[in-house]
Amino acid sequence: MATTLATDVRLSIAHQTRFALRLASTISSNPKSAASNAAFSPVSLHSALSLLAAGAGSATRDQLVATLGTGEVEGGHALAEQVVQFVLADASSAGGPRVAFANGVFVDASLLLKPSFQELAVCKYKAETQSVDFQTKAAEVTTQVNSWVEKVTSGRIKNILPSGSVDNTTKLVLANALYFKGAWTDQFDSYGTKNDYFYLLDGSSVQTPFMSSMDDDQYISSSDGLKVLKLPYKQGGDNRQFSMYILLPEAPGGLSSLAEKLSAEPDFLERHIPRQRVAIRQFKLPKFKISFGMEASDLLKCLGLQLPFSDEADFSEMVDSPMPQGLRVSSVFHQAFVEVNEQGTEAAASTAIKMVPQQARPPSVMDFIADHPFLFLLREDISGVVLFMGHVVNPLLSS
């Protein structure tokens, strides 16, 4: 796959990573989400908004493209095509991660999708397009969309559309769903899992199960008051490489400032990716499970995306509308599920709407003790596409 990624697509991936880090910083700075564990899927949100941009015109399209950072709307479509066909292709039959991703466009029967939009949605995004009856069967359509998402995510995301969120005024729903389940290349022995203290942001502590490594070394980098752990997943027969990264600030209360630094310095993440294994002395990583949902409109508005939610929105490239007024976005529902244990990671999400500088030589022996709040992300390393990201402030909290 590495040879199939054109320069413009690689640039779009870099912008998608920047979009992910801006989202993470905004979520971490929100008092409500900062006080709990959080998880989201940048690639799910990015894909949904990119498809939305395909149906937008004039200033609305320009604002979506600026928020996504794809440079031009075609860059988002090229990225989506690569993501759907290569990055998120299932690898389970060859012994790699189980990956499933799907896009859906559900449009009221009173409207017709423009042929150009429908063709792009189907060909580039591999989207299903369905004509539905929001006007008289809104509850049934809600169940239909929720069941579709639940199936794609192997039951992990059950109600992406909350009860009552769709009614007879709804005209169109864009939805996607992502599922990932991978086993670590080097699995942890459950016999080595023991309870220990995890220190919370308020200075108190809880006892939680910590996994320990039976290996003599791990992929770890350490600099700038930050330790980063890389945990690779077993691969299939292609050249993709999925990994989870644990970003542990030295300061127990350093989560928010770390998220800000990641957002402010585009190359900060890449500079701190571990590229060699180092000998370890003590190693402790808590098991965690996160189920996180949000209505993301306000979050996106904080990133500068205003027009799609306003009466000045222009989605004239999406539908042939018999209505005197156009369409606007009313809600963006997003849910994510991430579980990390001794065997590997299970994760799901849904959204409705290189030459590298050398690293400093690491110490001969290093500790990695994740006993205070940290960030995590799951990405495909060859392309750099970030599938999931979030933070853990208390491993005992699941939602």
UniProtKB/Swiss-Prot annotation:
InterPro entries: Serpin_CS (IPR023795), Serpin_dom (IPR023796), Serpin_fam (IPR000215), Serpin_sf (IPR036186), Serpin_sf_1 (IPR042178), Serpin_sf_2 (IPR042185). Disulfide bonds: none annotated. One of its GO terms (cellular component) is extracellular space. It comes from the Eukaryota. The keyword NAD does not apply. CDD domains: serpinP_plants. Residues 344-368 are annotated as: RCL. Signal peptide: none annotated. One of its GO terms (molecular function) is serine-type endopeptidase inhibitor activity. Keywords: Protease inhibitor, Serine protease inhibitor. The record marks 358-359 as: Reactive bond. Pfam families: Serpin. The keyword Transcription does not apply. The reactive center loop (RCL) extends out from the body of the protein and directs binding to the target protease. The protease cleaves the serpin at the reactive site within the RCL, establishing a covalent linkage between the carboxyl group of the serpin reactive site and the serine hydroxyl of the protease. The resulting inactive serpin-protease complex is highly stable. Belongs to the serpin family. Inhibits chymotrypsin and cathepsin G in vitro. This is Serpin-Z1B.
